[in-house]
């Protein structure tokens, strides 16, 4: 499952999509495209940032960007993004969302220690 935590974030970044459990949201790409097209319009072109923390854990592949062209997510454009390259205001919003939705953490692959670390993050 997934939650869209931001739209028209900044510049080319059109949306942020967060995994809300152990399933990778990229397995629901058609549903994501439908929801993003409803929010942004079917002619939207830009970048989508995926936070896969709940699906992948606090690993090197937590953040991935994909291009969206005219409402379609282009899977062949996937790029892994280092956490240091994610703007602080986005990290802060993601942490805020996780703190307010403990069910996301409970449905994730995160260990109890990982959950404590996520909840103690401060941006």
From Swiss-Prot:
It comes from the Bacteria. Probably degraded by CplXP and Lon proteases. Keywords: Toxin-antitoxin system. GO terms for cellular component: toxin-antitoxin complex. Induction: Not repressed by IscR. rnlA-rnlB forms an operon, the downstream rnlB also has its own promoter. InterPro entries: RnlB/LsoB_antitoxin (IPR031834). One of its GO terms (biological process) is single-species biofilm formation. Disruption phenotype: Essential, it cannot be deleted unless rnlA is also disrupted. Antitoxin component of a type II toxin-antitoxin (TA) system. A labile antitoxin (half-life of 2.1 minutes) that inhibits the endonuclease activity of cognate toxin RnlA but not that of non-cognate toxin LsoA. Can form a complex with cognate toxin RnlA. This is Antitoxin RnlB.
């Amino acid at each position: 499952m997934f939650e869209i935590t931001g739209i028209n974030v900044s510049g080319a970044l059109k949306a942020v999509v967060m995994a809300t459990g152990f399933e990778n949201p990229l397995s629901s790409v058609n549903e994501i495209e439908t929801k993003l097209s409803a929010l942004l319009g079917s002619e939207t072109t830009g970048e989508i940032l995926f936070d896969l923390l709940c699906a992948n854990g606090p690993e090197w592949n937590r953040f991935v960007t994909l291009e969206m062209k005219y409402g379609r997510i282009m899977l062949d454009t996937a790029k892994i993004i280092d956490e240091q390259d994610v703007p602080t205001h986005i990290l802060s919003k993601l942490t805020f969302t996780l703190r307010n939705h403990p069910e996301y953490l409970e449905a994730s692959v995160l260990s109890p220690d990982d959950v404590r670390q996520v909840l103690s993050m401060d941006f």
